[in-house]
Amino acid sequence: MASAPVDPRVCSIARTLDIVGEKWALLAVREVFLGNRRFDEMVHRTGAPRDTLAARLRTLVAAGILERRQYCEHPARFEYHLTDAGRDLYPVILTLMRWGDQYLADDDGPPLVLEHRCGHRLVPQVICQACGDPVHHGESKTAES
């Protein structure tokens, strides 16, 4: 039997997508993870329209995902840094990257390969925090909170 529909106003996925569900928002977060914290770097590396990227950065700052830090007074210039909430998006970014690498990479392979500190290629997976087993579709169910 299917579960009851989830009210989109109280769904954590819908709420999250309201903030990061737009292409330029997640690409801005990706850039900060990669160490590109300045607006002009982000515009150059993402190809985002300046006004659109500026709007997404304002949203991410207002949501507490990024924070602005001034690095130059004259003229005033800012860098963007991840907050704890922003750093918690790292598994999301990695999982999206893994999916894209698996289903959308061209013949040359993925455009960016990450290596774990152990020296092996990083292949992220979702695991159960309690038992450490990988989590697969169909192995979880909704529970009362």
Regions found by a protein language model. Name each.
Residues 11-52:
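N-terminal helix-turn-helix DNA-binding core of bacterial DNA-binding proteins
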Residues 21, 72-95:
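Basic, amphipathic "hinge/linker" alpha-helix immediately C-terminal to the N-terminal HTH DNA-binding motif
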Residues 39-71, 75:
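Canonical helix-turn-helix DNA-binding module
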Residues 101-145:
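C-terminal regulatory/oligomerization modules of transcriptional regulators
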